């Protein structure tokens, strides 16, 4: 009797401008690669828009495509990973937003994107990062992913 349990492995490229997720489904002795982008299979923009009065959050492609519309009512944050270099924080709708919290919203967007396409909750992933990303920035990414319910297994 062979083991036919379906197993998944996920990888995330957490980029400054865009993010992408890939999944590998393993069943029996074969793998199937599944790319998770937006509806057109494009990478997800690393942007977050936070409503200045209500605190509602828009992320990814929606935030990117609605940036003009959202610019008046939202604090628009792009290139999320570049915030890791700065002592950055913003008080928006009564909540103190840090780079870690903003990055967590991007991870949630990626996780939701996978779930909408497969009904699978991405709970673990390997995350691709630039070679020079120091330990403090990796810690921000690890904490942000954990806030989104994703355990980073390793960085590559």
Regions found by a protein language model. Give the residues of each.
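Phosphate-binding loop and its immediate beta->loop->alpha context
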Residues: 27-155
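Gly/Thr-rich phosphate-binding beta-strand-loop-beta motif of the actin/hexokinase/Hsp70
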Residues: 2-33
């Amino acid at each position: 009797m062979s083991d036919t349990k379906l197993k998944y492995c996920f990888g995330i490229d957490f980029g400054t401008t865009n993010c992408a997720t890939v999944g590998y489904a393993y069943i029996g002795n074969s793998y199937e690669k599944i790319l998770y982008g937006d509806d057109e299979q494009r990478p997800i923009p690393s942007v977050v828009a936070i409503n200045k009065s209500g605190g509602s959050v828009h992320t990814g492609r929606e935030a990117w495509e609605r940036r003009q519309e959202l610019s008046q009512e939202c604090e628009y944050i792009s290139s999320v990973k570049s915030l890791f270099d700065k002592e950055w924080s913003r008080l928006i709708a009564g909540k103190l937003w840090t780079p870690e919290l903003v990055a967590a919203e991007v991870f949630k967007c990626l996780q939701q994107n996978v779930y909408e396409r497969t009904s699978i909750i991405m709970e673990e992933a390997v995350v691709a990062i630039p070679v020079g990303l120091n330990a403090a920035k990796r810690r921000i990414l690890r904490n942000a992913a954990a806030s989104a319910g994703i355990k980073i297994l390793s960085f590559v």
